Amino acid sequence: MVSELTIKKWHFCQTLIQSIILLAVLILELVKQHFSLANKALTSWILILILAILSCLQFTLLKKKQNPHRRLVQFNYYWESFSITLSLQLTLYLIIIILNKYHILTNTFWIALATLYSLIMYIPMAKLALSKIKSTWGRILFPASIMFSLLLSAPDTFTYTKKIADWLIILNTSGFSGGIIFVIIMLIAMHNWGFQVPNWRISKRASKAIIGIILLFIIVKCLFNGFNASESWTSILTSWDFHLAKSITIPIFDSIKAGFAEEWLMRFCVLNLLLRYFKNYHNQILWAVLSDGLIFGLLHSTNFLNQSASATLQQMLGACCAGFVFAAIYLYSDSILISMGYHALYDTAMAITAGSLTMTSPSAFDWQETILLAIIDIIFAYFLISGSRKDTIEYNLRCRKL
């Protein structure tokens, strides 16, 4: 394990280099502009002052003794997690532009190198800022609402030109490489918050019959999500469309990213934090599953930006109830791999037929179908967390000290 002193040295070097680069680029750009002397000087000093303040705040993470319970200190941890994530990707972007301008090697080489480095460059932020957050709800909502989207979009910032290898465009624009970054960062944070690494194998207490039912449920649900083309109840079992969309590479990678990154966020991070929060509640498991599903549904509200309001509301309802099932499957099987696989297959089935994960405005029948599937999800999720299945879940939680 890398020592905190080494992490602090790493953070110091990154912060110093990024400050120098940002200031150098700022000065060069201002010199090029045709401002009056007074305006140019004023603008320069204001921007340099802002950058200096931001840099100084980032250096505060190097202080040896800080009271982690002080509100100002806690606020700084939130702020630095955000500002470091933003400034590092901006710095890499500017470096790539400069290297490209002077034709030093190829775009593909530098963007590939930047993508590789971005996999580890946020580690000091995770260790020195994000993992120091104390509030349980802060640990839940801050990564889910802000850090998730920031980190997933970070490598896409580098892909400012299409004059690079196709595989690099796919990895970065789909959010696949950003998803890997998020997994690494949250693994560090969760470790520092006292959580174990999630299991990949199925719990030895899980019934083979129940696992079989889960797998059957997954197959049927994915088939309906991707290939059922019915427009009325009379054709619900007879109308199927197995044609593939013309361009499916990026949607497939986007779906796989959703599978591993969103499940890492919602089931490994959020659900475990909720289980600890509700530990002394009478219905710990039920409250955790309900809260996890509701948060998962609410996170889809951001899709208002690229699709209709009715489509987003439909998606939020479906995601909320699907979240109950994802959580119940994870808790019963004790395997993050099953929930990841289900989520990835569910989205892939839709992506390869529609060519996108963006939804169109739903018809009256679409709403009826969504409500029916939501009810089925709720019933199945409750089945998995009740009766003898609940005993298995409680055993799994004891093994993970939850």
Role assignments for model-derived ranges:
Residues 10-29, 47-55, 77-93, 117, ...:
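Alpha-helical transmembrane segments
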Residues 167-174, 280-292, 335, 361-369:
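Membrane-interface starts of transmembrane alpha-helices
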Residues 4-13, 25, 29-42, 58-64, ...:
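C-terminal membrane module of polytopic membrane proteins
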Residues 273, 297, 315-328:
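Hydrophobic alpha-helical segments embedded in the membrane of multi-pass proteins
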Residues 261-291, 328-335:
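Membrane-interface helix/loop boundary segments of multi-pass membrane proteins
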Residues 1-8, 63-79, 131-134, 198-202, ...:
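Membrane-interfacial, low-structure loops and terminal tails that flank and connect transmembrane helices
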Residues 27-42, 97-118, 123-145, 154-264, ...:
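Juxtamembrane helix-loop-helix connectors linking adjacent transmembrane helices
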Residues 301-317:
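Interfacial helix-loop-helix junctions of multi-pass membrane proteins
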